[in-house]
Design a protein with these regions (language model features):
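Basic, Lys/Arg-enriched C-terminal extension of HTH/homeodomain DNA-binding domains
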Residues: 184-243
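Acidic, metal-coordinating helix/loop segments flanking the phosphotransfer/catalytic sites
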Residues: 35-53
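Short amphipathic alpha-helix used as the core "switch/output" element in two-component signaling
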Residues: 44, 66-77, 95
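Acidic catalytic/metal-coordinating carboxylates
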Residues: 37-38, 64-67
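C-terminal output helix
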Residues: 89-91, 105, 109-118, 164, ...
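Active-site residues of response regulator receiver
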Residues: 57, 85
C-alpha cells in the first residue's frame, strides 16, 4: 500500500494525554494518525487533513463534536465518526447515531471497542469511495456521448422502443438500433435494463442530467460534487481510556 492510500484517522480531543494514548493504540494496527485539540484546529489544518475516520470527543473548547458532525452532514461530507466522551448519556448517543455516527463510546472504554469501530469506519469510507469512483466513471462516459446518443438514451430510459424513437426523431429504426448499440458499449451497460438503471441513477444524481427531450436536445453535463473541497477550505491508550 502506498502512503497516499494508507487510511488517516483524525483524533479530535482537548486532552493531550488522551490524544497521545489514542495515537499509540491506533498505530498498533498501522494507521496514520493526525491529532487535533479542537474542531477549529482540525478545520484549519494546512494542508487540510482528509481522514478516512474521525475519532471525536463530544465536549471540546469552541465548537463541540456535535457541531462538527452537523457541519459535515450539511456539506454532504460522509466521513465516518466515532464519538468518545466522558459525559455521555442515552439521548446524546441516539442523537449521534441518528446523524450517522459509527459508534458512541463512553469513557472508559475497551481498546478493542475503539479499534473495531475505527475499522468499521475505514471500511465504510473505502466502500463509499469505491462507489464514488465507479459513478464518476459513469458520469464521464455519459459526458462522452453525442447529443443524439443522449437523446436516444433518455428516450430508452423512458421505455420507448426503437420504432417510437425513430418516429420522434425523424430517423430510421436501423439508425436508432445502431445508436443504441453504441450507447450500451460507451456506457458499459450489459443490457437495456442495465442502461435504464444507470440513467435513473444519473437523473437522481443530477436532475438536469437527463432533460426532457421534448424541450430540445440535452446540452448539459452532470455536475460533480465539490462539498469536500468546500469544507476543507473552511477549515491521534492502551488499556481503558479515560479522560
Amino acid at each position: 500500500m502506498n502512503d497516499s492510500d494508507q487510511p488517516i484517522v483524525a483524533v479530535i480531543d482537548d486532552d493531550e494525554s488522551v490524544r497521545e494514548s489514542l495515537r499509540g493504540l491506533l498505530e498498533t494496527i498501522s494507521l496514520k494518525v493526525a491529532l487535533f485539540r479542537s474542531v477549529e484546529a482540525f478545520l484549519g489544518a494546512n494542508p487540510p487533513v482528509l481522514p478516512s475516520c474521525i475519532v471525536l470527543d463530544v465536549r471540546l473548547p469552541g465548537a463541540s463534536g456535535f457541531e462538527l458532525q452537523k457541519q459535515l452532514v450539511a456539506a454532504h461530507v460522509d466521513t465516518p465518526i466515532v464519538f468518545i466522551t466522558g459525559h455521555g448519556d442515552i439521548p446524546m448517543s441516539v442523537r449521534a447515531m441518528k446523524a450517522g455516527a459509527i459508534e458512541f463510546l463512553s469513557k472508559p472504554f475497551r481498546e478493542q471497542e475503539l479499534l473495531d469501530a475505527v475499522r468499521q469506519g475505514i471500511e465504510r469510507h473505502r466502500a463509499r469511495a469505491g462507489q464514488r469512483r465507479a459513478w464518476a466513471q459513469i458520469h464521464e462516459r455519459f459526458a462522452g456521448l453525442t447529443d443524439r446518443e443522449k437523446e436516444i438514451m433518455t428516450l430508452l430510459a423512458r421505455g420507448r422502443v426503437s420504432k417510437q424513437i425513430a418516429g420522434q426523431l425523424g430517423v430510421s429504426e436501423v439508425t436508432v438500433r445502431v445508436h443504441r448499440s453504441q450507447i450500451l458499449q460507451k456506457m458499459g451497460a450489459s443490457s437495456l435494463a442495465d442502461l435504464v438503471r444507470i440513467a435513473d441513477r444519473l437523473k437522481t444524481d443530477d436532475e438536469n442530467a437527463l432533460d426532457p427531450v421534448a424541450e430540445g436536445p440535452y446540452d448539459g453535463l452532470p455536475r460533480t460534487s465539490r462539498t469536500a473541497k468546500r469544507v476543507t477550505r473552511k477549515q491521534k491508550g492502551r488499556g481503558n481510556l479515560a479522560k
